[in-house]
Amino acid sequence: MSPRMSAEDRRAQVIAEAITVFARFGYEGATTAAIAERVGVSQPYLFRLFPTKKDLFLAASEKNMNDTLSLMREAAGGKTGHDALDAMGQAYSEKLTSHREWLLMQLQTFAACYDEDVQRQTRLCLQEIWDEVEKLSGLQIEDRVIFFAKGMFCNVIAAAGRLDGQDEQWTPVLEALKAHTGRVHD
């Protein structure tokens, strides 16, 4: 028999499994029963950790956004300017293709912004990412806007299954996205 898991470790496990379920089914379509089953706990226990489905969705969404923030910090790795944006863009693009649930959870979070609590948290998380990219790159707002716009376009292309470069029609688009990640001013 395995040792008992601490509540903190169990919360992390629940959030990880919730991301998988919410990424696939969205806020409305996902059930706490499915999440509890994936974790191997009862629904009453799940609700002791997260009193409502919304609380669990918010925790999963925040974890997903924090992973994006960490990715940007790690990718920049002391670089500044366009070099930082290029490194962050490359890391982001790679994660989009290697961690589909991460992408889908982002999209499900945006789709759930009809809910004021989700919308508020999403704004705060996006602001934190925006501020960090500004701090890491030191670039003008126009460069950062293009960087974020390209990232959102990459989200759509990845969701449609075309970020992998396997479709010749999309090759020029992908090359343009990868070239000079956020350059307005050279």
Placement of each model-derived feature along the sequence:
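N-terminal intrinsically disordered/low-complexity leader segments
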Residues: 1-7, 172-186
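Residues at secondary-structure transition points
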Residues: 1-9, 13, 51, 55, ...
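Helix-turn-helix
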Residues: 13, 17-55, 59
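Solvent-exposed, amphipathic alpha-helical segments
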Residues: 17, 21-24, 71-75, 105, ...
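Hydrophobic alpha-helical connector segments
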Residues: 59, 66, 70-100
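Amphipathic alpha-helical packing segments from all-alpha helical-bundle domains
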Residues: 66-70, 96-98, 115-142
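Helix-loop "lid/cap" segments that line or gate small-molecule binding pockets
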Residues: 90-97, 105-115
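Hydrophobic alpha-helical segments that form the core
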Residues: 101-107, 126-180
